[in-house]
């Protein structure tokens, strides 16, 4: 009798770099090799095999190589047949340059779960707009150089199952809504309006985040989504981290804060708005699904999300008993 031999492989996490690289110094002239090595070492400690795409250690200006090299790196990540998860090294700027250069049908055929954030929200959008493929918004690879139990627990829990559950604190009005759960970086979303890579989603629940944008600019971007007919076609808006939004809000009668901006948007869009979700450019960011059906409810102080059909990798380190020396146990 012939005994069947099963090959067991360790889960593979592919790191790619469609935008900027981490740099050192005020002149941004040197590649921060140490931070990249540190993040990959921590990912390996969590049980991943880590593979870099060919452009990850390249540097042209502040980018991870030329536009062609970065596009090839992104395609390489999606073409890797053993990939379980794709993380981007960091955000910054430059991903949108690559959108016409990627074969999105090939990318959509990948079994890997793509995780975007910040500038790489452009990839989430293009994947869904062209192929309908679900993905994630969550931490960039470089974030893992620093231990953060809350971030890591959220990341691991999210990827475990095709059904996603979340209960989190927010502020705003009570509502119940069902629809496609999607979103990401507000500046990137608005920059894609009118392009082939912007998702056409009606009756969705849109979540947004940003960093270093004052309240008036946040309002202006949300107003663009209203006037483009995007926000008014959603059932609710969830606002995540807006780090630095009130830094230049001013004082006294002339003060204009994020809460002022969101109150105006709520009136104009005529949809419920919840704010304060721990998601975005935050050390303990949540990981959220992109492009999946969901049921969302808020009582004004807490938000409950159940999402279905999420991108759950076939192989994850924490699905099996982890080695005893892993730092999060």
What residue spans do the PLM features occupy?
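Conserved anion/nucleotide-ligand pocket segment
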Residues: 132-194
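ATP/nucleoside-binding phosphotransfer catalytic cores, i.e., glycine-rich phosphate-binding loops
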Residues: 241-329
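Short internal beta-strands
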Residues: 52-54, 116, 234-241, 274-276
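ATP/NTP phosphate-donor binding region
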Residues: 1-82
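N-terminal glycine-rich "phosphate-gripper" loop used for MgATP/nucleotide binding
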Residues: 85-96, 117
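A short helix->loop->beta-strand "cap" motif at the edges of active sites that frequently abuts
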Residues: 11, 82, 107-113, 131-133, ...
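Short, acidic/small-residue loops that bind anionic groups at enzyme active sites
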Residues: 102-126, 134-141, 272
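Internal helical hairpin/lid segments
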Residues: 200-258
């Amino acid at each position: 009798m012939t005994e069947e031999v099963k090959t067991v492989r360790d889960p593979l996490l592919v790191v790619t770099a469609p935008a900027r690289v981490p740099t050192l110094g005020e002149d941004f002239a040197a590649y921060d090799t140490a931070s990249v090595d540190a993040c990959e070492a921590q990912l390996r400690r969590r049980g991943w095999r880590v593979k870099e795409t060919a452009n990850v250690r390249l540097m042209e200006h502040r980018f991870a190589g030329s536009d062609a090299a970065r596009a090839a790196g992104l395609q390489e990540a999606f073409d890797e047949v053993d990939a379980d998860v794709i993380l981007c090294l960091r955000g910054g700027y430059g991903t949108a340059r690559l959108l016409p250069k990627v074969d999105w049908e090939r990318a959509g055929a990948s079994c890997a779960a793509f995780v975007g954030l910040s500038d790489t929200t452009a990839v989430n959008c293009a994947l869904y707009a062209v192929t309908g493929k679900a993905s994630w918004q969550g931490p960039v690879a470089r974030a893992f150089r620093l231990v953060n139990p809350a971030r890591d627990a959220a990341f691991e829990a999210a990827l475990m199952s095709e059904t996603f559950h979340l209960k989190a604190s927010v502020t705003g009005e009570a509502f119940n809504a069902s629809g496609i759960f999607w979103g990401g970086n507000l500046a990137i979303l608005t920059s894609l309006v009118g392009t082939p890579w912007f998702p056409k989603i009606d009756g969705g629940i849109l979540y947004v985040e940003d960093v270093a944008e004052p309240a008036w600019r946040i309002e202006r971007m949300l107003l663009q989504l209203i006037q483009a007919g995007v926000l008014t076609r959603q059932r609710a808006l969830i606002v995540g981290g807006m780090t630095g939004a009130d830094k230049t809000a001013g004082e006294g009668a002339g003060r204009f804060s994020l809460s002022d901006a969101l109150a105006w948007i709520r009136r104009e869009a005529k949809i419920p708005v919840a704010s304060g979700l721990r998601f975005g450019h935050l050390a303990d960011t949540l990981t959220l699904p992109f492009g999946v059906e969901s049921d969302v409810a808020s009582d004004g102080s807490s938000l409950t999300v159940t999402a279905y059909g999420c991108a759950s990798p076939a192989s994850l380190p924490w699905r099996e008993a982890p080695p005893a020396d892993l730092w999060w146990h």
